[in-house]
Amino acid sequence: MKKNRLLLIALLLVWLAPSFAARVDTLLVKSPSMNKEIKVVVVTPDAALGKKAVSCPAVYLLHGFGGHAKTWIEIKPNLPQIADEKGIIFVCPDGSTSWYWDSPKDSSFRYETFVSSELVKYIDGHYKTIADRKGRAITGLSM
């Protein structure tokens, strides 16, 4: 009887305990300058979700040459946990093989404009960010 009661209490505690888990979204974000959609992975901490959401800083993580939008999630699988622990929104755009610059000859390669302007506006408009340059950072692999 005591074992059953203890098991029931343990199950209730697990069931009633709040679960905190960052949300990982894979999006297609329209780039007006390139006239195409770019894949972007956004990791949103629990703090920036729901009715009591607070504004969180956004860190833009750029992959290295040959990478893609999911590279950071693959090499750092605990990124959602870090997002929750630190209260950071991680934004991981697919930069293709662009080196994140604007080509003067090819209008389909304007990744600097996309990352520094278009994507920032999209993220600030769709996520609970600190919508100011003081609330943003950018870094990457092999930069």
Predicted regions and their residues:
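Bacterial N-terminal signal peptides that target proteins for export
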Residues: 1-7
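Generic detector of short alpha-helix boundary/capping microenvironments
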Residues: 9-10, 30
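Hydrophobic h-region of N-terminal signal peptides that target proteins for export
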Residues: 10-20
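Non-catalytic cap/lid and distal C-terminal segments of serine-dependent acyl enzymes
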Residues: 21-143
